[in-house]
A protein has these predicted regions:
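Charged, gly/pro-rich active-site loop segments
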Residues: 78-150
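Short, basic/aromatic recognition patches
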Residues: 1-20
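Short beta-strand segments
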Residues: 16-50, 66-67
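Short, structured patches in soluble enzyme cores that scaffold and shape functional sites
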Residues: 25, 68-70, 139-142
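Structural motif corresponding to alpha-helix initiation and N-cap regions
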Residues: 6, 51-52
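Beta-strand-connecting loop/turn residues
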Residues: 41-43, 62, 141
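Helix-adjacent hinge/juxtasegments
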Residues: 54-89
């Protein structure tokens, strides 16, 4: 295994929209899949959720990790890890960031998967049945990455 350069880590983050979010809840680490968008201009990860233990946990302890991988095979993969702080967004900035999230993910899908998507539910499983979506970002403090190639 070798370390990824900063530009390679950013490429992994830019070229994907599915990752894993790690946070602490009641003293235990939790890791869940998320749909995200990497905003290189703000150096943030943008996502959204609904009320529940994940958002409660991040409100209490804003230290989180996001992990993203590109796996070709067991012997050929890249993994990027982001350590940062959770920040809940509100009002116009939340609307702006959610728009960036939607358009950014749609662009990645068009480029990588060569298909058109029109609605958020085509690429994100979060339902609005539990109220208004909570838009958040992870301010990136530290990044790391690994690669394995044979």
């Amino acid at each position: 295994m070798t370390d990824l350069t900063t530009s390679a880590i950013e490429r992994v983050l830019r070229n994907n929209y599915l990752g894993h979010l790690a946070y602490l809840w009641q003293g235990k680490p939790h890791v869940i899949p998320i749909t995200y968008y990497f905003d290189p201009a703000d150096n943030t990860i943008i996502s959204y959720t609904s009320e529940g233990h994940k958002i409660d946990a991040m409100r209490k302890n804003n230290s989180v990790t996001v992990q993203v991988e590109e796996i070709q095979s067991m012997f050929n993969w890249e993994s990027a890890m982001v350590h940062g702080t959770f920040e809940e967004l509100e009002g116009d900035i939340a609307k702006q960031k959610l728009h960036s999230f939607i358009e950014g993910v749609k662009s990645i899908i068009r480029r990588k998967e060569r298909r058109e998507v029109e609605f958020i539910n085509e690429f994100s499983s979060k339902l609005y049945s539990r109220g208004i979506p909570i838009v958040y970002q992870v301010k990136i403090l530290e990044i790391a990455g690994k690669r394995r190639e044979t």
